[in-house]
Amino acid sequence: MHRLDGKVALVTGCGGIGLGWGNGKAISVLLARQGASVFGVDLTHAAAETTCNLIREEGGTAQLHVADVTRAAQVRAMVETCMERFGRIDILINNVGRSEPGSPVDMTEETWNEQMDVNVKSAFLTCKSVLPIMEAQGGGSVVNISSVAGLRYAGKPQVAYAAGKAALMQLTQTTAVIYAARGVRLNCVVPGLMLTPLVERLADKYANGDFQGFVARRHKQVPMGRMGDAWDVANAVLFLASDESRYITAQQIVVDGGLTASTGL
């Protein structure tokens, strides 16, 4: 008996290419290991295929789907395809996100709008299509992946990303209250500094490609002395997706090794 037997999980940003575990890949694989059928969505076929193949190799059930979740028509088609394949959606994981550097002065309006689309609008669109399904089923769990950048300054000039992730948390909380009496729960997992394949790209953007130095600085910023990893995020997601958290809604689980409670940034 697994914690998610018989449930269907739609995971956006599920993909991962090459070695290492990103949040989306770890979340998708862990949900499948706990019995969920995973409808894995990513912007590229190769990224989604990598994750879905891992699930199938372990004996789980997964179907991949390619979509840009900032586009309303593609989101509607994505949800329709999931329903045609599985007939229900019990769990929605909104895991897409992207960070670009910049302050209000030097960031272009185009970059600002793109950041809002990826980090906030995507979750708005998926909720718009999935919440009526969950309500009709009598329940469901939505877990949105935010960031400590939405809670406090996180050491990098990323004003749009920070604003977007803060907005995502408020979108989650407000919608959770609206849907509480309808049996649908919405919560956020809020990762801190995580050692995932994404860190190499962040080092290029924020540390002139000095990967080792960037990683060392991030480890030192965390009170526990190290960054977390994708499995720390995935385990928090699993709890919120499962019936073990049935009385928890409109909340944030911060997974950061004490970072946001410290002054170490």
State the predicted function of each range:
Residues 103-104, 111-113, 214, 218:
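Substrate-binding pocket helix/loop in short-chain dehydrogenase/reductase
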